[in-house]
Amino acid sequence: MRTAFGRQFDVPDGYLNTAGIGVPPVCAGDAVAAGVDDWRRGAARPSDFDPAVAAGRAAFADLVGVAVDRVAIGASVSTLVGLIAAALPAGGRVLVAEGEFTSVSFPFAAQAVRGVSVIECPLEALGERAPGFDLVAVSVVQSADGRTVDLDALRAARASGTAVVLDATQSLGWLPTRLDWADAVVCAGYKWLLCPRGVAWLAVDPVSNLDLVPHQACWYAGRDVWQSIYGLPLRLADSARRFDASPAWFSHVGAAAVLPWLAGLDRAAVRAHCVGLADAVRTGLDLPPAGSAIVAVDRPDVADRLAAAGVVGSLRAGAVRLSFHLYNTAADAARVLDALT
């Protein structure tokens, strides 16, 4: 058992795979288990989960830096990006980074039947290339290797008329950034936000030119949720809640147990902790510091050597990806270096 930033974690030594699956605080796991136990005993009621959904939504808004009425709930990044892709005009042009995580790029590529084209370019060139495109979509931090996009360049591109869609899945939770200026921000909860799989959020700019249609309109997106269960007419919320999907209840229970805590932490201290460990590994491997919590190691036999040392990472794009979160320690970094040096 470890204690980090005031919470206990039952995370094993050498676990460096938050970029794949985040490990929740013990209290969050207990909250989900209690919810499942209520369900098993027939003690759960649908409305019981509304406070958890609201708490997670509010904390996500805080983390991104937007008003809560700009936030919708979903189940995955790809379905939320799909709403945006479907809103592009026929023949629209989209720019993405080379090797981008496909939950960001595939929904746009699937619109080829309407003449939408998706162009790849190097991550470092996105800001320069973006003007002239209808939309640029990119992860704030790249999943494969932890590189960070130049947000200032993208913000300048937006001023020229290009819509900007950001996936914060690999950044939110360790990288403090205010993203209220983007047209849309999507984020899955099960990595750095330490939530169960099945919860994601979408923050939308109400003055954006994105003409989103609530294709997954449901009772939970209603103006008054519990008065929107039966019958027409359509009566959706006036806020971003109109884009809500029905909540995966227990995922939101977990989110409510962890996100308010994350949102209340000293975010600069969290970043310094995570990046400090990652850069210590880079330095020990004669790699330059990168200012990222993710390290990609592409060396012969690295996967076998790390596995033998009890290090848990992921193989991504031909390299072993190691990710350092707030529950990791200097001992985890030392375990990597002992195995590889």
Task: Go through each PLM region and give its residues.
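Pyridoxal 5′-phosphate
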Residues: 1-341
